[in-house]
């Protein structure tokens, strides 16, 4: 499955980047393709392109702040608190698989 994700926490420091790493590791274990955009204290990094969005199966927004979803129109979007990704990254991805079947 091709997953695009955004991680963002209120401070934009640690959890944003830890969640990114946890999602990447879980996706690798499950055989998924993933790209994670971070919206942290230093701004947006690894920004998702329109082409990547078009090719994605699902968009995962793991954020405790507001994320603009306009660019994801027509795509399935799953929103989940960043704390869930921090604790259960593989479980979050498994739930997405279930919803997409």
Residue ranges and their predicted role:
Residues 2-11, 60-61:
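Short glycine-rich or small-residue beta-strand-to-loop segments that form or flank ligand, phosphate
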Residues 14, 69-70:
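Glycine/Thr-rich phosphate-binding loops of Rossmann-like dinucleotide-binding domains
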Residues 29-56:
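N-terminal beta-loop-helix "entrance" segment that forms/cooperates
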Residues 56, 74-75:
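Short, well-ordered alpha-helix to beta-strand connector turns
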Residues 59-60, 77:
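Short, well-ordered beta-strand core segments
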Residues 62-67:
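Short, polar loop motifs at secondary-structure junctions
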């Amino acid at each position: 499955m091709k997953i695009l994700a955004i991680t963002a926490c209120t401070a934009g420091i640690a959890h944003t980047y830890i969640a990114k790493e946890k999602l990447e590791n879980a996706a690798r274990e499950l055989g998924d393709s993933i790209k994670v955009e971070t919206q942290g204290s230093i701004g947006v990094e690894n920004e998702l392109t329109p082409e990547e969005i078009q090719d994605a199966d699902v968009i995962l927004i793991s954020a405790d702040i507001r994320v603009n979803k306009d660019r994801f129109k027509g795509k399935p979007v799953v929103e989940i608190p960043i704390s869930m990704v921090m604790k259960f990254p593989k479980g979050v991805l498994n739930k997405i698989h279930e919803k997409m079947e």
